Amino acid sequence: MVKPRVIYWFRTDLRLHDSPALKAALDLDPSVFWPIFTWDPHYVYRARGGLNRWQFLEAPQTLFPKLFKAWKVTHIVFEKDTDSYARERDSIVTQAAKDAGVEVIIRSGRTLWDSDQIVEKHGGKPTMSITQLQAAGSKLGQVKKPIPAPKNLPDPGDMPVNFDQDEPDTKPDFNSEIRTEGDKTYTKISGPKGDFAIETMEELGFPPATTPHRGGETLALKALDEIIADKKYTATFQKPKTSPAQFEPQATTLLSPHLHFGSLSVREFYWRVKDVVDSYKGASSPPESLIGQLLFRDMYFAAQAALGYVFSQTANNPYCRFIPWHLPSKRDPETGLVTGEYHVDSEEADIWFKRWKAGMTGFPWIDALMRQLKDEGWIHHLGRHAVACFLTRGGCYIDWERGCEVFEEWLIDHEPACNVGNWQWLSCSAFFSQYFRCYSPVAFGQKWDKKGEFIRRYVPELKNMDAKYIYEPWKAPLTDQKKAGVRVKGDGLNNVEEGTYPKPMFDFAKRRDVCISSMKVAYQVGLHGNDGQALDGTWRKLFPTDRGEVQGDVESGYGEHADEEGKSDNEAKEEGEGTSSVKKEDDTTKGKRSARRHSTEKVPKKKKV
């Protein structure tokens, strides 16, 4: 009998420790073992990915059938991926393998519990709270213990690639703006230099990344060891009590990127923490604890697994409230899925969106967070709260899908399920409904950092501003502005002068009241994304014409509203961390299609909730 010839397909499981799929591959006792990672063109072109998340280009759907034949493959093994695009891709690869007589082995390992099994135990419905997740998880039993890394791997055999390459469709290319050269491919499995090394950004046609954060299994396990060594921190961690203004080092673990790429096993993290918590008197508990963050992550993964593509949009999503935001998404008339384009129903709201993305809102706390996000690919979860609330229900009244797309592009820990879920949560579109709890772009930052050191670090224009004015520089007298070496003028986008910082986009107190009033109406109307009136446009008859009206007032000095502290069960609990260019955007960005949500998948029939 011929011994197995096995391809192991690495995707979001870039590790050797606790890999059920890798163990299944090695348990076959293969005579030949090929560990393969492919640059999937979907993520190169159609998924927004900034430089900080890039560290043989052909679609796996066409590449693997060729490898099956050229290498006489008998088995292909990979870890399960419930992201919507990944399901579609894996279905095609699986069918191609079966057609070629290749056995397919798939194992779950990306989450604490198998997301599909969670959905099954939850009656086929998405998990909308960690209480629901825990109830479904309890029916599956405790989280499985991690398995050790293999001591060695079989050598790969010959790897001929003397077959024609099917070049992928490169349009639309969401990442064209950040390429310095044409996209690059190579035809040797060993890479462009023949040394099997990870490609550099330059070798892929991009400028160097700017993030200080680095990946890899070795660094992930070292970071976990350091966290676990501090038993008090590990056992008493409460995420809402960690500071979004703390940097170098940050206040939280920063392990979320490792969970995304799979360089750290979520089960390894869970059990290492649980062992400390179980032996520590006075330990914190979910949802605020470290384990609570992992539960939120599983909750979002299961919600996505239940709904598929429509989870990532309002349209046709029966669990997402319909709110008539500014800059709403356009939809494909055939599939009902959003395209990545958006309607500009308000030119001023479009300018607000551009200023928010550029970190030029005129509110230093918001701008510091957005600049940190772009430069480093990561911000603290409360920082994500602040900028998301500001863009949606607490300031601009702009569609959460616009912010979700920016996070998709810039976050190094971008998980599609967590990013979408967090934006729905923070916009009060799903998961959370206390829309009257808004984050002040002034008072909330002052709560953590009265002197404004975080702002001085990420908004260097204001580094010499007196602490009295650093959160509200427009209130500083001209003499104080001159002393600080900065003038508050302009919008930060057009005719920007050196030594200036923009005026605030609007009077926050007024905008907050407008947004809360508009949210109240939306909740009273009570439409969800799959309701006919939300889909056919007749919702307009149910809403006043001044919904979330745009009205800027940049000159007034105004009062601030600190975030209210009331909590109730799932309502006020904090979401998981894995939530997800200052250059001015041009109008072409509105015409790009997002394959993150666009597919030929059929839209499910409406269902009442």
Regions found by a protein language model. Name each.
Residues 73-86, 387:
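Acidic beta-strand-to-loop metal/phosphate-binding motif
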Residues 238-243, 251-254, 334-339, 347-359, ...:
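Active-site-adjacent structural elements in folded domains
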Residues 61-67, 95, 99:
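Structural beta-alpha unit
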Residues 1-63, 540:
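N-terminal beta-strand-loop-alpha-helix module at the start
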Residues 52-55, 85, 122, 247, ...:
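Secondary-structure capping and boundary motifs in well-ordered enzyme cores
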Residues 311, 317-322, 383-432:
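Active/binding-pocket-proximal capping segment
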Residues 123-334, 338, 449, 453, ...:
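Glycine/tryptophan-enriched, flexible segments
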